[in-house]
Amino acid sequence: MYSSPLCLTQDEFHPFIEALLPHVRAFAYTWFNLQARKRKYFKKHEKRMSKDEERAVKDELLGEKPEVKQKWASRLLAKLRKDIRPECREDFVLSITGKKAPGCVLSNPDQKGKMRRIDCLRQADKVWRLDLVMVILFKGIPLESTDGERLVKAAQCGHPVLCVQPHHIGVAVKELDLYLAYFVRERDAEQSGSPRTGMGSDQEDSKPITLDTTDFQESFVTSGVFSVTELIQVSRTPVVTGTGPNFSLGELQGHLAYDLNPASTGLRRTLPSTSSSGSKRHKSGSMEEDVDTSPGGDYYTSPSSPTSSSRNWTEDMEGGISSPVKKTEMDKSPFNSPSPQDSPRLSSFTQHHRPVIAVHSGIARSPHPSSALHFPTTSILPQTASTYFPHTAIRYPPHLNPQDPLKDLVSLACDPASQQPGPLNGSGQLKMPSHCLSAQMLAPPPPGLPRLALPPATKPATTSEGGATSPTSPSYSPPDTSPANRSFVGLGPRDPAGIYQAQSWYLG
């Protein structure tokens, strides 16, 4: 399901995933993979792992690269999103992020109407109940795949059979668990030298209790390789911060569209350029990250775009200034992944004048890839304007066009029969009917091709200072027209209108 790069890109960059990723515990990656390693070892050798082997696997998983853990968490969150009913996804995100009181989150049932089970690793033969996965992911509780009967739904849960809300799921503590907890607390109290507190009433605390360590060791055998302190520490560490060196919190905040710090809305996402997954994210382009559709047909617009960097999840779900775009249309855009050889003008345009598309090419070319990019918190585009052209994947805000809005850019108001190119003049210039072309629609051709000639008008066209001339009536230029009388659409690299006209060439 996730073997194709397209599917990976769509799933890993969904706003649903980016909002929940900071709340996933790093322990979940270690725990799920450790269980899979132990199971694989037992099937291969027909015996259980030794303590030393299991401890080595645990240390290896704990020291895994952060981008690997985040990629795994993104895939798992994508699976969970598809198993949650579309009408419950927004409430689920808001409740996990603390923006809304927890409510029931219903999952899609299996064929028998019960809780579904999913595999949490690629090509894994073990399946886990959805509610078990939720508790491990967002609470960091070390549960086995057979511990589904230990889960208890809260009293306020109205759908205990299909609800996967972590705040509605608790773990039943048996007498054996309480008994073991007593010995753990006693041992911690002895090691720290502090008196034991909170074990009962004051009268019970005043009585001396002797701890028979020998009897405890004879009755119980520790099967795990986590110590109490280590288990609590790793189970409380988020997957986005439970990492080694070269992965600071600032980079993580820049990577996430939903920042850990709500006030820092100007940070853009970055990833270390040394990781393979990071290069894939840059290479895959940023346009398929911004928008995705749910099975119900709803569009989600990523707040990583400049127009929505200051909007919350609810505004993204309701829709804002930037209209959603299909990925098939985005891939046609020549600005999807600019190469390092792009001109400075193109780079500056893609970083400052794209209304919907978030660009990562600047990050890849940055001399300091480990530092997060800072952008102004205010939106580049006017927040009140909504007159984008809806006919194509790339929409331009009104402030990029100093002239009047284009009437119909995609059809050009031309009859197909009248779009046949005219004869070539002596200089090899191609003549086009002036009723099909205007200075606002024309743009410089790609390098290596002759420039299009703009036929002069029969009447002198009025020209505003800094604006482009527009012919008033159709006419043709004879082949012997002198070069001084020919008008060409050629703009200097510093002309601000050149940026806009360079775009219209790709929309033709």
From Swiss-Prot:
The modification N-acetylmethionine is found at residue 1. It comes from the Eukaryota. The modification Asymmetric dimethylarginine is found at residues 365, 395. It is found in: Nucleus. Residues 190-209, 267-348, 438-495 are annotated as: Disordered. Residues 299-310 have a biased composition (Low complexity). SMART domains: DWA. The modification Omega-N-methylarginine is found at residues 365, 451. The keyword Cytoplasm does not apply. GO terms for biological process: DNA replication; negative regulation of transcription by RNA polymerase II; odontogenesis of dentin-containing tooth; positive regulation of transcription by RNA polymerase II; regulation of transcription by RNA polymerase II; transcription by RNA polymerase II. Keywords: Acetylation, Activator, DNA replication, DNA-binding, Methylation, Nucleus, Phosphoprotein, Transcription, Transcription regulation. One of its GO terms (cellular component) is fibrillar center. A motif (9aaTAD) lies at residues 404-412. GO terms for molecular function: DNA-binding transcription activator activity, RNA polymerase II-specific; DNA-binding transcription factor activity; DNA-binding transcription factor activity, RNA polymerase II-specific; RNA polymerase II cis-regulatory region sequence-specific DNA binding; sequence-specific double-stranded DNA binding. The modification Phosphoserine is found at residues 194, 294, 302, 304-305, 323, 333, 337, 339, 343, 475, 477, 487. InterPro entries: CTF/NFI (IPR000647), CTF/NFI_DNA-bd-dom (IPR020604), CTF/NFI_DNA-bd_CS (IPR019739), CTF/NFI_DNA-bd_N (IPR019548), MAD_homology1_Dwarfin-type (IPR003619). Its main location: nucleus. Residues 1-195 bind DNA. Belongs to the CTF/NF-I family. Binds DNA as a homodimer. Recognizes and binds the palindromic sequence 5'-TTGGCNNNNNGCCAA-3' present in viral and cellular promoters and in the origin of replication of adenovirus type 2. These proteins are individually capable of activating transcription and replication. The 9aaTAD motif is a transactivation domain present in a large number of yeast and animal transcription factors. This is Nuclear factor 1 C-type. The lineage of its organism: Eukaryota, Metazoa, Chordata, Craniata, Vertebrata.
